[in-house]
């Protein structure tokens, strides 16, 4: 039986490897003629990729490119990732050449994360097609294509939207999109906007786009992307792709789960802001006061921010009392628990959790929908503001805390100023009391789960992608 080899290259960073691994596992399960090599480009910041994200699966292997500290010299906030990927092209070329020379497989193509699309140059050298694996939402992809087309055909400069109250008509959204929820990189005049839209052009030039979404969540955006009159390659919505295995088994996780077991059903507000999420001391105190005022039970994942001069992951607090209001832990001990790192999927899956205050990262959004837990939107960076807009305005699946919040105010908005006690408290109260949001999320839960099983739209889309890989020529 001949084997077709796919080379996956995820972007560096904690959130990119797991969905890549899950997609690879899904493809291998569906077609035993496939094999996958995942090339991991390691960053020098923070811990290495968790080994839990690397299962022992037949026909799946990982090749690490060691951390190269010389890449620290490439730092520029909005263009670093592009330079980082370019820097790794020679190593990727050597790895792929080794695969071809040592294995009796047919190299079928590259599957590239958005920021890794320049690696399509390497794929072209080997005469194989490139596919994009878009791990954010379909609506965001549509916005990228829209702004890229306007730049290339109309000379449109998206950076002029900085500080603007303009609303944009974007085909992948039903409602006008406020400029204030655009990702900061779109507004960056120092190379970030150009890099972002150049990546959109690269994606448009690919042979196909795998999107971690589904009709149940983003029907409108997916219909636009698949309308066949916009110069966009075939789109394969295969989501939600999630790691549903809660393998973490340690004393801290056990303690968290025991505490949740003692809480009434749907009574707990879970606050968690992703692998890079943290706040300054003033904002932490505002959150604490809001939680206490709301009176709701809570589980709060609280991380220490890193110094501004360093680029690394947030750390654990050694003493929570140093950052929380005096007496907070004692006063709330009967209804709440403050933790460091959180086993997010295990928490969201627990029946006692009734709401999720989230940064709206796409992985977290999909996990929340899968578990049927309503969200309160508090985005921090990247495309999370767009995700918040999608959830709050487009779909009605989330309450708003502050949709246009940014941790970095370089783009010129005041969205990075502290969110007030009142905003947070109002968001939590709406999150836990709005029956309409809860019912909508329950409906999406059922439909998104149906999408990935046999007979579902995403299940069918995976099959179409495998067929495409088998037949496509560059």
From Swiss-Prot:
Pfam families recorded: UDPGT
EC number per UniProt: 2.4.1.-
SUPFAM superfamilies on file: UDP-Glycosyltransferase/glycogen phosphorylase (SSF53756)
Coiled-coil positions: none
Keyword ATP-binding: no
UniProt entry keywords in alphabetical sequence: Glycosyltransferase, Transferase
Chain positions recorded as UDP-alpha-D-glucose binding sites: 275, 341-342, 359-367, 381-384
InterPro entries: UDP-glycosyltransf_plant, UDP_glucos_trans, UDP_glycos_trans_CS
KW Transferase (keyword) present: yes
One Gene Ontology term of the molecular function aspect: UDP-glucosyltransferase activity
Known function: May glycosylate diterpenes or flavonols in leaves.
Family: Belongs to the UDP-glycosyltransferase family.
Name of the featured protein: UDP-glycosyltransferase 71E1
The organism of origin for this protein: Stevia rebaudiana
């Amino acid at each position: 039986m001949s084997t077709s080899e796919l080379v996956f290259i995820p972007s560096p960073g904690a959130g990119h490897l797991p969905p890549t691994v899950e997609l690879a596992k899904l493809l291998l399960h569906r077609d035993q003629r496939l094999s996958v090599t995942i090339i991991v480009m390691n960053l020098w910041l923070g811990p290495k990729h968790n080994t839990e994200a690397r299962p022992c699966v037949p026909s799946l292997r990982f090749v690490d490119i060691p951390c190269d500290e010389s890449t620290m010299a490439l730092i520029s906030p909005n263009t670093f990732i592009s330079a980082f990927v370019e820097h790794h092209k020679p190593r990727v070329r050597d790895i792929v050449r080794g695969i071809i020379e040592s294995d009796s497989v047919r190299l079928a193509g590259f599957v590239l994360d958005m920021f890794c699309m320049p690696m399509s140059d390497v794929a072209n050298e080997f005469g194989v097609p490139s596919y994009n694996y878009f791990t954010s939402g379909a609506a965001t992809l549509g916005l990228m294509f829209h702004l890229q087309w306007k730049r290339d055909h109309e000379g449109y400069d998206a950076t002029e939207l900085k500080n603007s109250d303009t609303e944009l008509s974007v085909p992948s959204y039903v409602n006008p999109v406020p400029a204030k929820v655009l990702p900061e990189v779109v507004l960056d005049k120092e190379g970030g906007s150009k890099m972002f839209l150049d990546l959109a052009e690269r994606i448009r030039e690919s042979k196909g786009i795998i999107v971690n979404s589904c009709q149940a969540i983003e029907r409108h955006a997916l219909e636009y992307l698949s309308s066949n009159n916009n110069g966009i390659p075939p789109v394969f919505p295969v989501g939600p792709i999630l790691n549903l295995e809660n393998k973490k088994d340690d004393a801290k996780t056990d303690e968290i789960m025991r505490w949740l077991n003692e809480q009434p059903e749907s009574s707990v507000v879970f606050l968690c802001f992703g692998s890079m999420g943290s706040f300054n001391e003033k904002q932490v105190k505002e959150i604490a006061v809001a939680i206490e005022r709301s009176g709701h039970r809570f589980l709060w994942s609280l991380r220490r921010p890193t110094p501004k001069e360093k680029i690394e992951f947030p750390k654990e607090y050694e003493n929570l009392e140093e950052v929380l209001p005096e007496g907070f832990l004692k006063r709330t001990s009967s209804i709440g628990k403050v933790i460091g790192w959180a086993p997010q999927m295990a928490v969201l899956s627990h029946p006692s959790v009734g709401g999720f205050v989230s940064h709206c990262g796409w992985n977290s959004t999909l996990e929340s929908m899968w578990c049927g837990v309503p969200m309160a939107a508090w985005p921090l960076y990247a495309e999370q503001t767009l995700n918040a807009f999608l959830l709050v305005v487009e779909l009605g699946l989330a309450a708003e805390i502050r949709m246009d919040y940014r941790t970095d105010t370089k783009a010129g908005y005041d969205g990075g100023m502290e969110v007030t006690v009142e905003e947070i408290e109002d968001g939590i109260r709406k999150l836990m009391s709005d029956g309409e949001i809860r019912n909508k999320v329950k409906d999406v839960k059922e439909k998104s789960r149906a999408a990935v099983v046999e007979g579902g739209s995403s299940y069918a889309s995976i099959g179409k992608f495998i067929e495409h890989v088998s037949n496509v020529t560059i």
